[in-house]
Amino acid sequence: MSVSLSKGGNVSLSKTAPSMKNVLVGLGWDARSTDGQDFDLDASAFLLAANGKVRGDADFIFYNNLKSADGSVTHTGDNRTGEGDGDDESLKIKLDAVPGDVDKIIFVVTIHDAQARRQSFGQVSGAFIRLVNDDNQTEVARYDLTEDASTETAMLFGELYRHNGAWKFRAVGLGYAGGLASVCAQYGINAS
C-alpha cells in the first residue's frame, strides 16, 4: 500500500519496502492552458555528498547526462510535451549501487526556456512525485504538490536520503524563481 505524503513528510524505505533494491522515481505534471507556447518540463537528479553539494558535474543526471558514472542513477529520457496520464519522466535508482559518499539524491523539475516563454509552475497542475519498487512495480510513496508556485520556474519535488544507514524519502515541494541555473548554483554545478 502506497504512503501518501504531505509537504515535509517522510517515509522509511526499510520499513515500508524492506526488500526494495531498485527504485523508480516517477514525476508527472499537466500544463494548464497557455498562449500556445509549448510547455517542456524536465526532470533531473542531483547526487549530493555530506556537504550538500555534488561531488562533480557527473552527479547531475538530466536529459544530456542520462546516467551517473557509477550506473546507480539512470534518467529514462526526455518527454517534451508532458501529455498523457501517468509519469511524464522517470529516473531509476539502484540503491545498493549508490556510492557510500552520496548522502542524498534530490529530484528537481524545471521548465525549459521558462523566462523566454514567460512560464512558471503557476501554470502547471497535477504535479506529483512517486516512488515505485521497480522489482515488482508496487507504488511505495506518493506526494501530490498542491502549492501555488506562481513565480517559480524550478521545483525540488522530493529527495531520497540516508538516515542511520537506511534510505528514506522526503516530500519537499521547494520552488526556485531562478530556474535550473539557481538550482545548479545551490548544489555546486556551473550551469553557464
UniProtKB/Swiss-Prot annotation:
Disulfide bonds: none
Pfam families: TerD
GO biological process, one term: response to tellurium ion
Record keyword Acyltransferase present: no
Keyword annotations of the record: Plasmid, Tellurium resistance
CDD domains with a match to the protein in the record: TerD_like (cd06974)
Gene3D superfamilies tied to this protein: sav2460 like domains
Family: Belongs to the CAPAB/TerDEXZ family.
Function: Not known; seems to contribute to the tellurium resistance (Ter) mechanism.
Classification via PANTHER family: CAMP-BINDING PROTEIN 1-RELATED, GENERAL STRESS PROTEIN 16U
This protein's name: Tellurium resistance protein TerD
Organism annotation: Alcaligenes sp
Gene: terD
